[in-house]
Regions:
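Beta-propeller blade-edge and WD-like acidic-aromatic loop motif
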Residues: 3, 21-39, 61, 65-86, ...
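Short linear segments in intrinsically disordered or otherwise low-structure-confidence regions
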Residues: 5, 9-14
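Extracellular/periplasmic ectodomains of large secreted or surface enzymes and adhesion receptors
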Residues: 12-13, 21-41, 45, 272-298, ...
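Conserved beta-strand positions that form and line the central face of beta-propeller blades
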Residues: 43, 86-87, 125-127, 179-183, ...
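Conserved beta-propeller blade repeats
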Residues: 46-63, 89-109, 131-149, 155, ...
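Flexible loop/turn segments at secondary-structure boundaries
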Residues: 211-212, 237, 258-259, 281-282, ...
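Cap/lid segment of the alpha/beta-hydrolase catalytic domain
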Residues: 390-507, 511-512, 519-520, 554-555
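Active-site-proximal cap/loop segments of hydrolase catalytic domains
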Residues: 471-666
């Protein structure tokens, strides 16, 4: 569903002084088009990496999800090489595959229900389902129970259910699913959890009202449901993983202002730092792939180190009674096991602790699975081995734009960093000046990583620079920077983005034509910066962003509402209300000058479609130049390949028309 509006008798774009382009940028009155040999939208949409890799208990196979016939299915593949075997055949997407301890079964999620399937046979059984949804299935270490998270009582509670018994012959009737039991009480949302090696306890992460500035870890007794706090009283602590012998856990904490890996006792009264320094060794969500993993022999651990928009994988010794020095940020070259600069996430250790299974990507390579040897093996000549190949042969990445780190001082003196991607036409002896697309990431508690993002390459292929900005509030720069936009949404963080645009316009490679692009919080930033400094922009693209954050608090889903409350307080609080109003671009629509493209999914629960409906109504009233397109079958984000392809085309066409001012040669 598409709607266009162009003001009568006006171009919808304010006049701007544009730097004179270097000779060669314009030929015969037309903007020179990029080479036809570059990446196409069709190629970019066809690149689909496997996801959600899970290593089998014996280390011989890996389960993962990949698209097949329009839905993601679970596949199995030998770690040492071989052709993938499709395990599931479901109409709805399958996700989150989890091996049973004996390696004979896999639990997974499909259509918000928990299912189990036998690895060597066709038997598939329903574990549990509920209209409120179910997620995160995890096997008890004895294989007799499966825990999961469900909102069936209105909160993200931990539940436990008996696992279906492996098939022994064909049953005469369809067995009835066991009834699950709640393990944690209502009133608390569980974010993540992990079983202890003996199956008697669970370490669970949660954020508990009214304190939203800490993340806590509790040990839950499976038999009684009693909980014991071991971490997070005064800091953000998450990502717990049990040591193999059950004597303690690894986790990440920002106690010193940066996310570090620590070893903590089961009682929580003893801690040992395993990393140190001014770099992040985890992220606030404690997300899969970013948590520290102890080796099976208990002697080592693997963790991430985030810097300069990159994520390295480090291996360190388990510091305990030996007094081994912790890994120090920026000085751990010999401990880095990731083979190239990019974004790395640990999947798991081989059972003999000899290697790590990991996912690696970069701005030139999509996600692929790798087997990474230990540092001593690398010193003896062992090499990392790539197990999957997601990039089609027809796609030549040699000409792809590669990120360059930049930094500038914001108007209040804060140093803000980002990553710049220049098109080929802006590099070399015959370089021409080019426009620049400023990109704000989502979150905002996130950062713009130098990972596989086809749209930035498509922008570069079209002849425009692409500058991703880590405005205040981004992760990767320590706690002080991460909290720097508390109470400041749409204000000082928007100033950072505007200052980045001014920095870009002053560079010799830029011709002064600027656009802003972003999704989710980045889409919200589009509206904010276009309203804050209208004459700066040639175009803006808003993908499912907020327009009125007070109304978003009232109409969005619970996780989004809690995030807003953490960062801005409650909109009905008289002290917070002015900041909510200031941070809502809906009330400044009359200031917007640049043409605006808005894309949104009708099933979005995080950013309610009401946000786009309200901004479109205001744009219509003010007679602004805009286009809006709705995806009737999409939630927050564009999940379907065909919709992603359509969105890329709409965005590029919009930029070509309003920034490049290209004339259709046909």
């Amino acid at each position: 569903v598409t709607h266009r509006h162009e003001p009568r008798g006006a171009s919808g774009r304010a006049e701007r002084a544009v730097a004179e382009p270097i000779r060669g940028a314009v030929e015969n009155g037309r903007v020179r088009r990029p080479s036809r040999d570059g990446l196409t939208i069709e190629q970019a949409a066809a690149i689909e990496s496997p996801r959600e890799f899970r290593l089998s208990p014996d280390g011989r196979r890996v389960a993962f999800t990949a698209e097949a016939a329009g839905a993601r299915q679970i596949f199995l593949m030998p770690v040492r090489g071989g052709y993938p075997e499709q395990l599931t055949a479901t109409e709805k997407p399958a996700s989150d595959p989890q091996w049973s301890p004996d390696g004979r079964r896999i639990a997974f999620v499909c259509d918000e229900a928990i299912w189990m399937i036998e690895v060597e046979g066709s038997h598939q059984a329903l574990v549990t389902q509920h209209p409120a949804g179910n997620r995160s299935p995890r096997w008890c270490t004895d294989g007799h129970q499966i825990a999961f998270i469900s909102r069936r009582r209105g909160w993200d509670q931990l539940w436990v259910v008996d696992a279906p018994v492996p098939r022994r012959g064909r049953p005469a009737t369809r067995p009835r699913s066991a009834e699950p039991a709640a393990l944690t009480k209502t009133g608390v949302d569980i974010d993540d959890y992990v079983w202890s090696p003996d199956g008697r306890q669970i370490a669970a992460t949660s954020q508990r009202l009214p304190d939203l500035l800490t993340s806590q870890i509790h040990i839950v007794d499976v038999a009684t449901g009693q909980q014991r706090l071991i971490a997070g009283e005064v800091s953000w602590e998450t990502g717990p993983r049990w040591l193999p012998d059950g004597s303690g856990l690894l986790m990440i904490t920002d106690e010193d202002g940066w996310f570090q890996v620590v070893r903590v006792s089961v009682e929580g009264n003893e801690r040992t730092a395993l990393t140190t320094g001014r770099r992040e060794h985890g992220e606030p969500g404690g997300g899969w792939g970013y948590v520290p993993l102890p080796s099976p022999d208990g002697k080592r651990f693997v963790c991430v180190e985030i810097h300069d928009g990159l994520v390295d994988l480090l291996v360190g010794e388990m510091a305990c009674a030996t007094g081994t020095d912790p890994l120090r940020a920026g000085e751990s070259g010999s401990a880095v096991v990731s083979p190239f600069e990019g974004i790395w996430m640990a999947v798991g250790w081989l059972p003999d602790s000899s290697a790590i299974l990991a996912i690696g990507s970069s701005d030139r390579q999509p996600d692929d699975l790798w087997l990474l040897p230990m540092p001593e093996a690398i010193a003896e000549g062992a090499k990392p081995r790539k197990l999957t190949r997601s990039l089609p042969t027809v796609v030549d990445t040699a000409h792809f734009a590669v990120g360059t780190r930049i930094a500038f001082e914001a108007r209040d003196g804060l140093v803000v960093e980002g990553t710049l991607y220049l098109p080929a036409s802006a590099v070399g002896e015959e370089a021409t000046r080019v426009p620049c697309v400023i990109h704000s990431h989502g979150g905002p508690t996130h950062q713009a990583l130098r990972d596989w993002l086809p749209f930035r390459q498509l922008v570069a292929e079209a002849g425009m620079a692409f500058l991703s900005v880590d405005f205040r509030g981004s992760t990767g720069y320590g706690r002080e920077f991460r909290w720097a936009n508390r109470g400041e949404w749409g204000h000082t963080d928007a100033f950072d983005v505007i200052d980045a645009a001014h920095w870009a316009a002053a560079q010799t490679w830029c011709d002064g034509r600027l656009a802003h692009y972003g999704a989710s919080y980045g889409g919200y930033m589009t509206l904010c910066v276009l309203a804050e400094e209208p004459s700066l922009w040639r175009a803006g693209i808003d993908l499912y962003g907020d327009s009125d954050i007070a109304e978003s608090y009232r109409h969005g889903d619970r996780p989004g509402r809690i995030d807003l409350e953490r960062m801005m307080g409650k909109p009905d609080d008289p002290e917070a209300a002015p900041a909510y109003r200031r941070g809502s671009p809906l009330y400044r629509v009359e200031r917007i000058e640049a043409p605006l493209l808005i894309l949104h999914g009708r099933k979005d629960k995080r950013v309610s479609p009401l946000m786009t409906e309200k901004i479109v109504e205001a744009l219509e009233i003010e007679g602004k130049h805009y286009q809006v397109h709705w995806y009737d079958d999409e939630p927050h984000g564009l999940k379907k390949r065909e919709n992603g392809r359509d969105a890329w085309k709409r965005c590029l066409d919009f930029l070509r028309r309003h920034v490049l001012e290209q004339v259709d040669e046909d």
